[in-house]
Amino acid sequence: MSFGLGRGRALEPGAVAVSEAELPPMSDAVMTDPLAGRVDPRAWFADPGRPLEIEIGSGKGTFLIQHAEQHPETNFLGIEWAREFFEYAADRIRRRRAGLADEETGRDELSAAPARALLNVRMLHADASEFIRWRVPDGIVRVIHLYFSDPWPKSRHHRRRVVQDRFLAEAARVLVPGGEVRVVTDHAELWAWDSAYFADWAEDPSGLLDREAAARGAADVARERRERPVGMPGVKPFVMAPFARSAGAGEGELVGTNFERKYRREGRAFWAVVLRRA
């Protein structure tokens, strides 16, 4: 299925896309040594010494571009599973690097500021949860951005939702002390699911947990844990914190993604929170 994102023009991810040479296929050695597949993604950037942030589900790349332009001192890795969206986002970044017109600008209200080099942005076509689990070394990521992820509303698809025990365990592992998982969604059922997990993984000294939502999501989470059990933390590795709007967001926005702008026009409600690594 094609979404026609290129509007008849071939999409060219170019050097923005992480290549197979940079991320070779995992060898069979990971069956006996899980660390054998680890690769430091900081090496994929022009300045590997900068802090690293990861966006899960970059879509058309709007947040990634805006945030990277606002924070040139930080490296950003966008991960997108849908190939056409991955190619489209990488192509947008490549064109802005080259000073070419951004074909999305007029429709998604992306800042009309002069294009910057954006050498601090790379795109990866992968399953983000699996990439973080098998590839990312301990303690190297400052922020994981998770905005408007697929809610997978059917019960048989709940296992595909990003927030799970395994994901939260791996996020805690790869984040630096004080690092963050930043979450925004418009989907009430997904928020209930997420909140039920947050209750078990994050301390809540400020009363930020949506306890009503967590109670609604508890049955689905309990069923998921019975079917695919994963060890629970002995000590909660996160602390819940309020969500502060992103620097590149427009007036009244939280992060400024394409989905957020679309859903705001539709009058939808939003939920947001930060999990900070203790």
Task: Please describe what each predicted stretch is.
Residues 1-54, 62-71, 93-138:
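S-adenosyl-L-methionine
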Residues 59:
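Conserved glycine-rich SAM-binding loop
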Residues 82:
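Conserved SAM/SAH-binding beta-strand->alpha-helix loop
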Residues 89:
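Conserved SAM-binding loop
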Residues 163-177:
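A short glycine-rich, Lys/Arg-flanked "PGG" loop and its adjoining helix->strand segment in the class I
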Residues 177-185:
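Conserved beta-strand signature within the Rossmann-like core of class I S-adenosyl-L-methionine
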Residues 190, 196, 201-278:
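Class I S-adenosyl-L-methionine
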